[in-house]
Structures are given as C-alpha cells and as structure tokens.
C-alpha cells in the first residue's frame, strides 16, 4: 500500500439508486513512497522493480492498482452499484485531484536520484534513491580489449590517473575528493 493515499468510499445519490464510489484519498504527510520537487511530481518508489521512477504514469498505474485491489477484495460487501474512480478515467476527476495534491497541497520533499552507480548485481533499497540500474554486474573479469586500448592510447602514468578517477567514481569517493 502506498503511504500517501488511502482508498475511500462515498455514496452518491442518483435518481433511481445509490452509487458507491471508490476513490483515492491523498494524505498530506511526508511520504517515503512519493517525492515532490519544484512543486510537482518528481518520483515514486516501485517496489517490484526495486527502483524509483520519475515517470508520472507509473504513479497513476500504482494508484489504479490499489483501487482495483480494494474493489476486488470488497466487491461482495457492497450493496448497489459500485463505481471505481480510476486515475486513467479523465471524467472521474481523480487526475485533477492528483495534480492539485502534487502541485498545490504538498511541499517539496525529495532526495536527489542516481547519485550512486547501481550495477545489475547490486542490492538496492529505497534509501539508495536509484532510478536506474546498469545492465552489467561489477565483478572481476578479463579486460584484454580494454587493456590493449588503454596501453595504445595512454602512457602508464596517464592510464593510472584515469583508472584512479574511474575507481573513485565507482566507490563513491569522488564526491568527497576536492
């Protein structure tokens, strides 16, 4: 469950019968699943990927999934007509509520993303604030082509400097070096 919303219901009076609406109610709080930057959506945590996403469509799909799950769990308990107010349905007005929530009601609350290299074999958690993962692992291996290229292009001393700089980036020390 996303920590910045709760699924709510309300009853609307119709001419002939009551309609139960299921909708997302956005909570004003410092969220660990949602980031707001510059007065707008910045990123959302996607648990299945183990990464943050800066694509707002991912946020809308996660909210819609929560709505659908709630409906599926509770559908036997409702009497009358049930209407789920999905984010994808512009006529429901929920997308406008979402934009109002992100742009007007919430204050900036974010961490910079992708300040650390994440390799394919890296364990990632939410606090790594990563939205991208490299497609290859960081592990020892043969680098014959790299060695040949570097020894052709650079002297041993220059190569050492370049590899030192690359190493400082990979280990994260480059942020502390002046």
Roles of regions detected by a PLM:
Residues 1-4, 46-74:
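Short, small/acidic-rich helices and loops at N termini and domain boundaries
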Residues 1-14:
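N-terminal non-globular leader segments, chiefly Sec-dependent signal peptides
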């Amino acid at each position: 469950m996303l920590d910045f919303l709760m699924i709510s219901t309300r009853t609307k009076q119709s001419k002939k019968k009551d309609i139960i609406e299921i909708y997302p109610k956005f909570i004003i709080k410092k969220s660990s699943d949602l980031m707001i930057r510059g007065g707008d959506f910045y990123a959302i945590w996607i648990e299945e990927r183990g990464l943050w996403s800066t694509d707002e469509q991912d946020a809308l799909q996660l909210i819609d999934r929560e709505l659908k799950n709630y409906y599926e769990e509770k559908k036997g308990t409702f009497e009358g007509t049930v209407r789920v107010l999905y984010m994808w349905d512009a006529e429901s007005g929920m997308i406008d509520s979402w934009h109002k929530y992100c742009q007007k009601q919430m204050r900036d609350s974010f961490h910079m993303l992708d300040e650390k290299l994440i390799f394919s074999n890296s364990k990632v958690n939410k606090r790594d604030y990563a939205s991208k993962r490299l497609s290859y692992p960081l592990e020892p291996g043969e680098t014959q082509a790299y060695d040949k290229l570097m020894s052709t292009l650079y002297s041993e001393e220059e190569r050492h400097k370049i590899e030192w700089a690359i190493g400082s980036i990979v280990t994260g020390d480059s942020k502390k070096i002046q």
